[in-house]
Amino acid sequence: MASLGSGNWSGVPTQSTAPMPWVTILQPFPWTVPSSQPQHNRVKEDLLELMMLQNAQMHQLLLGQLVADALNPGPEWPSPPVHTDSHEEQMEEEMEMQEQEPLVYHHHYLPCPVTPLGPMSLWPASFLPVPPHQPPWQGEPRIQHQPPASRQEEVRDVPPPPPPSATGTVGADVPPASDYYDAESLP
Protein backbone atom coordinates (compact mmCIF):
# COMPACT_ATOMS: atom_id res chain seq x y z
CA MET A 1 0.00 0.00 0.00
CA ALA A 2 1.36 3.39 -0.79
CA SER A 3 1.39 6.38 1.46
CA LEU A 4 -0.30 9.44 0.12
CA GLY A 5 2.12 12.25 0.74
CA SER A 6 5.54 10.76 0.05
CA GLY A 7 5.29 9.69 -3.55
CA ASN A 8 7.15 6.49 -2.70
CA TRP A 9 5.66 3.60 -4.69
CA SER A 10 8.14 0.98 -3.58
CA GLY A 11 5.66 -0.58 -1.16
CA VAL A 12 7.53 0.32 2.01
CA PRO A 13 5.78 3.09 3.95
CA THR A 14 7.85 5.80 5.51
CA GLN A 15 8.02 6.24 9.26
CA SER A 16 6.16 9.53 9.26
CA THR A 17 2.86 8.25 7.84
CA ALA A 18 0.26 6.20 9.75
CA PRO A 19 -0.94 2.95 8.14
CA MET A 20 -4.25 3.17 6.29
CA PRO A 21 -7.14 1.07 7.74
CA TRP A 22 -8.83 -1.53 5.56
CA VAL A 23 -11.83 -0.26 3.68
CA THR A 24 -14.85 -2.47 2.96
CA ILE A 25 -16.79 -1.54 -0.13
CA LEU A 26 -20.40 -2.68 -0.28
CA GLN A 27 -21.93 -2.88 -3.69
CA PRO A 28 -25.68 -3.52 -3.91
CA PHE A 29 -26.67 -6.48 -6.02
CA PRO A 30 -29.54 -6.07 -8.43
CA TRP A 31 -32.75 -7.29 -6.83
CA THR A 32 -34.17 -10.40 -8.33
CA VAL A 33 -37.91 -10.80 -8.15
CA PRO A 34 -38.92 -14.40 -7.47
CA SER A 35 -41.37 -15.86 -9.88
CA SER A 36 -44.99 -15.66 -8.79
CA GLN A 37 -45.62 -19.29 -9.72
CA PRO A 38 -44.11 -21.76 -7.27
CA GLN A 39 -41.91 -24.28 -8.94
CA HIS A 40 -43.18 -27.83 -8.53
CA ASN A 41 -39.81 -29.27 -7.54
CA ARG A 42 -39.15 -26.42 -5.10
CA VAL A 43 -42.36 -27.13 -3.18
CA LYS A 44 -41.27 -30.71 -2.67
CA GLU A 45 -37.83 -29.55 -1.55
CA ASP A 46 -39.34 -27.07 0.91
CA LEU A 47 -41.67 -29.70 2.32
CA LEU A 48 -38.82 -32.16 2.70
CA GLU A 49 -36.71 -29.50 4.41
CA LEU A 50 -39.54 -28.69 6.84
CA MET A 51 -40.02 -32.36 7.63
CA MET A 52 -36.31 -32.76 8.30
CA LEU A 53 -36.36 -29.72 10.59
CA GLN A 54 -39.33 -31.13 12.49
CA ASN A 55 -37.58 -34.47 12.82
CA ALA A 56 -34.46 -32.77 14.17
CA GLN A 57 -36.52 -30.75 16.66
CA MET A 58 -38.34 -33.84 17.93
CA HIS A 59 -35.02 -35.65 18.24
CA GLN A 60 -33.63 -32.71 20.21
CA LEU A 61 -36.67 -32.66 22.52
CA LEU A 62 -36.48 -36.37 23.21
CA LEU A 63 -32.76 -36.31 23.88
CA GLY A 64 -33.17 -33.26 26.11
CA GLN A 65 -35.86 -35.06 28.12
CA LEU A 66 -33.67 -38.15 28.44
CA VAL A 67 -30.75 -36.04 29.68
CA ALA A 68 -32.99 -34.19 32.14
CA ASP A 69 -34.35 -37.48 33.48
CA ALA A 70 -30.84 -38.88 33.82
CA LEU A 71 -29.56 -35.81 35.68
CA ASN A 72 -32.60 -35.36 37.94
CA PRO A 73 -34.03 -38.76 38.80
CA GLY A 74 -37.60 -38.36 39.93
CA PRO A 75 -39.70 -40.62 42.12
CA GLU A 76 -40.06 -44.11 40.78
CA TRP A 77 -43.41 -45.27 39.53
CA PRO A 78 -45.31 -47.49 41.94
CA SER A 79 -44.91 -51.14 41.11
CA PRO A 80 -47.98 -53.37 40.81
CA PRO A 81 -48.88 -55.13 44.04
CA VAL A 82 -47.57 -58.64 44.44
CA HIS A 83 -50.18 -61.17 45.57
CA THR A 84 -48.94 -63.77 48.01
CA ASP A 85 -52.26 -65.58 48.53
CA SER A 86 -52.14 -69.29 48.84
CA HIS A 87 -53.72 -71.56 46.26
CA GLU A 88 -56.62 -72.41 48.60
CA GLU A 89 -57.45 -68.73 49.18
CA GLN A 90 -57.51 -68.10 45.45
CA MET A 91 -59.87 -71.05 44.91
CA GLU A 92 -62.19 -69.77 47.66
CA GLU A 93 -62.32 -66.32 46.07
CA GLU A 94 -63.18 -67.82 42.68
CA MET A 95 -65.97 -69.92 44.22
CA GLU A 96 -67.40 -66.83 45.96
CA MET A 97 -67.38 -64.92 42.68
CA GLN A 98 -69.21 -67.76 40.91
CA GLU A 99 -71.82 -68.02 43.68
CA GLN A 100 -72.76 -64.35 43.45
CA GLU A 101 -75.64 -63.61 41.12
CA PRO A 102 -74.90 -61.52 38.04
CA LEU A 103 -75.63 -57.84 38.26
CA VAL A 104 -78.64 -56.59 36.33
CA TYR A 105 -78.73 -52.97 35.31
CA HIS A 106 -82.06 -51.32 34.64
CA HIS A 107 -82.02 -48.21 32.50
CA HIS A 108 -84.68 -45.67 33.31
CA TYR A 109 -84.91 -42.74 30.97
CA LEU A 110 -86.40 -39.43 31.95
CA PRO A 111 -88.72 -37.79 29.45
CA CYS A 112 -87.16 -35.24 27.17
CA PRO A 113 -87.66 -31.69 28.46
CA VAL A 114 -89.97 -29.75 26.19
CA THR A 115 -89.14 -26.12 25.64
CA PRO A 116 -92.04 -23.76 25.11
CA LEU A 117 -92.37 -22.82 21.48
CA GLY A 118 -92.24 -19.11 21.00
CA PRO A 119 -91.48 -16.86 18.08
CA MET A 120 -88.55 -18.86 16.77
CA SER A 121 -87.38 -18.73 13.20
CA LEU A 122 -86.86 -21.95 11.32
CA TRP A 123 -83.73 -20.55 9.71
CA PRO A 124 -80.67 -20.51 12.03
CA ALA A 125 -79.63 -16.90 11.59
CA SER A 126 -81.80 -13.94 10.82
CA PHE A 127 -79.13 -12.22 8.75
CA LEU A 128 -78.89 -15.10 6.29
CA PRO A 129 -81.29 -15.03 3.37
CA VAL A 130 -83.85 -17.80 3.03
CA PRO A 131 -82.79 -20.28 0.36
CA PRO A 132 -84.60 -19.72 -2.94
CA HIS A 133 -86.14 -23.21 -2.98
CA GLN A 134 -87.89 -22.68 0.39
CA PRO A 135 -90.75 -20.28 0.98
CA PRO A 136 -90.29 -18.01 3.99
CA TRP A 137 -91.86 -19.13 7.27
CA GLN A 138 -95.47 -18.03 7.50
CA GLY A 139 -96.45 -18.18 11.18
CA GLU A 140 -97.93 -21.30 12.78
CA PRO A 141 -97.44 -24.68 11.09
CA ARG A 142 -100.48 -26.18 9.37
CA ILE A 143 -101.83 -29.60 10.27
CA GLN A 144 -103.66 -31.45 7.55
CA HIS A 145 -106.09 -34.18 8.60
CA GLN A 146 -106.56 -37.08 6.23
CA PRO A 147 -109.09 -39.90 6.50
CA PRO A 148 -107.65 -43.11 7.92
CA ALA A 149 -106.48 -45.65 5.39
CA SER A 150 -108.32 -48.93 5.11
CA ARG A 151 -106.87 -51.93 6.98
CA GLN A 152 -106.28 -53.86 3.74
CA GLU A 153 -104.04 -51.19 2.20
CA GLU A 154 -102.19 -50.38 5.43
CA VAL A 155 -98.52 -51.32 5.22
CA ARG A 156 -96.24 -50.79 8.17
CA ASP A 157 -93.03 -49.05 7.17
CA VAL A 158 -91.61 -49.10 10.67
CA PRO A 159 -92.13 -51.95 13.14
CA PRO A 160 -93.69 -51.08 16.48
CA PRO A 161 -91.36 -50.41 19.39
CA PRO A 162 -90.38 -53.38 21.55
CA PRO A 163 -92.47 -54.01 24.63
CA PRO A 164 -91.05 -52.77 27.93
CA SER A 165 -90.40 -56.35 29.04
CA ALA A 166 -88.02 -56.85 26.10
CA THR A 167 -85.85 -54.01 27.35
CA GLY A 168 -85.51 -55.55 30.80
CA THR A 169 -87.87 -53.20 32.63
CA VAL A 170 -90.54 -55.70 33.73
CA GLY A 171 -92.08 -54.73 37.00
CA ALA A 172 -95.35 -54.67 38.89
CA ASP A 173 -96.79 -51.93 36.68
CA VAL A 174 -95.37 -53.19 33.34
CA PRO A 175 -97.18 -56.08 31.62
CA PRO A 176 -95.10 -58.87 30.07
CA ALA A 177 -94.63 -59.06 26.31
CA SER A 178 -97.42 -61.59 25.71
CA ASP A 179 -99.98 -59.16 27.13
CA TYR A 180 -98.51 -56.18 25.30
CA TYR A 181 -99.49 -57.22 21.76
CA ASP A 182 -102.80 -58.67 20.79
CA ALA A 183 -103.23 -60.96 17.81
CA GLU A 184 -105.30 -58.44 15.83
CA SER A 185 -102.61 -55.76 15.84
CA LEU A 186 -100.01 -58.03 14.26
CA PRO A 187 -99.97 -58.31 10.43
UniProtKB/Swiss-Prot annotation:
- Pfam families recorded: DUF4587 (PF15248)
- The source's superkingdom equals Eukaryota
Which InterPro entries has this protein been placed in? DUF4587, PRR29-like
Residues of the region (Disordered) are 133-187
Q: What is this protein called?
A: Proline-rich protein 29
